[in-house]
């Protein structure tokens, strides 16, 4: 369960293992805060979401320090294959801020409800809705920049 969640935050298998380890270390250190009023799986899922979110923030900060991201050449049409689409989706998600990326991942990639996504992120439902709206708007702009227009 935790490893599957971490795959949403990185595709690097070795990094997934490190993030899973970080989740369990954080869970162990936070064990006193577990109240038992919700399933342990839910509590661990919340910790995993926060660990993944911090990973994105750190990754983005490190990238900005080292080099500017290279831009993908504009496309004249939609991606031809599933592999192209997956590559483009990964590139577009990398362009979003960690907050935007978290909202998109929880709501659209994992298919969670707004209340559930908000709880996992530690945000209010209103904040989740606003963040998701802004993230979708940014994704549309990035798609148009790549020459792919939303219908």
Which residues does each PLM region occupy?
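C-terminal flanking helix
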Residues: 3, 24, 97, 101, ...
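Amphipathic, Lys/Arg- and hydrophobic-enriched alpha-helical face
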Residues: 1-13, 30, 45, 93, ...
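C-terminal edge and immediately downstream basic/flexible tail or linker adjoining helix-turn-helix-like DNA-binding
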Residues: 64-71, 76, 81-82, 91-92, ...
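Helix-turn-helix DNA-binding module
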Residues: 94-102, 110-127, 138
